């Protein structure tokens, strides 16, 4: 059993050493494209046209 543990330790040691010394690859941050122009415009005024179509009913 001791021989098996020793063999596992000897086999794992190079993997640990290589893992600690190797540089991890980091992907560069990609800058997102600017938003389309229509997103930057103010929202349309829908209430004014609807007020002409929909009006409160008159009380009789």
UniProtKB/Swiss-Prot annotation:
Lipidation, N-palmitoyl cysteine type: 20
Q: Where in the cell is it found?
A: Host cell outer membrane
Q: Which residues form the signal peptide?
A: 1-19
Q: What is the membrane topology listed in the Swiss-Prot or TrEMBL record?
A: Lipid-anchor
* Cellular component terms per the entry's GO annotation: host cell outer membrane; host cell plasma membrane; membrane
| Chain segments carrying region Proline-rich | 32-44
Q: Which UniProt keywords apply?
A: Cytolysis, Disulfide bond, Host cell lysis by virus, Host cell outer membrane, Host membrane, Lipoprotein, Membrane, Palmitate, Signal, Viral release from host cell
The record describes its quaternary structure and partners as:
Homodimer; disulfide-linked. Interacts (via C-terminus) with the spanin inner membrane subunit (via C-terminus). Part of the spanin complex which spans the entire periplasmic space. The spanin complex is composed of one homodimer of the i-spanin linked by intermolecular disulfide bonds involving two Cys residues and one homodimer of the o-spanin covalently linked by an intermolecular disulfide bond involving one Cys.
Q: Which family does it belong to?
A: Belongs to the Lambdavirus o-spanin family.
Can you name this protein? Answer: Spanin, outer lipoprotein subunit
In its UniProt entry, the species of origin is given as: Escherichia phage lambda
